[in-house]
Amino acid sequence: MNSLDFHRLLMEKVGFSLTTLQLRGFIVDMEIGVLEEEQGVTQRIRFDVDVFLNGADKPIEDEIDMVLDYDFIRSAISRIISNGRSNLLESLVADLLDALLIPVEVIGCSVSATKLDIYDGESEIGCSMLKLKE
């Protein structure tokens, strides 16, 4: 399923009213990778996250406790990383998706994790996953 298909399914699920919380370019140093040269060293990993909420209504009050606090995204990343080393970006991203889907307000999310330093030059490699709550 490509990103366009995912967004189409998302809109079918919620109608035409959707809020997206975003975290872009959140970079952490962490140990990850299966290759011998990746063992015992940290790499810069960039996270880009979209968290989808049903509805697009103005909060009843203009106060932080009326909305899902964006910091839960960064906290989820920190928690997943603190659980221990991952060999695969796919495992890391899947674990993060599951953590981000916990709040009742969340109906779906998209997570990308990108290794910034694995290749020389401008090349990057990464993994993206999209998931809707059932």
PLM segments and residue spans:
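N-terminal, polar/charged subdomain of small-to-medium soluble alpha/beta proteins
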Residues: 2-134
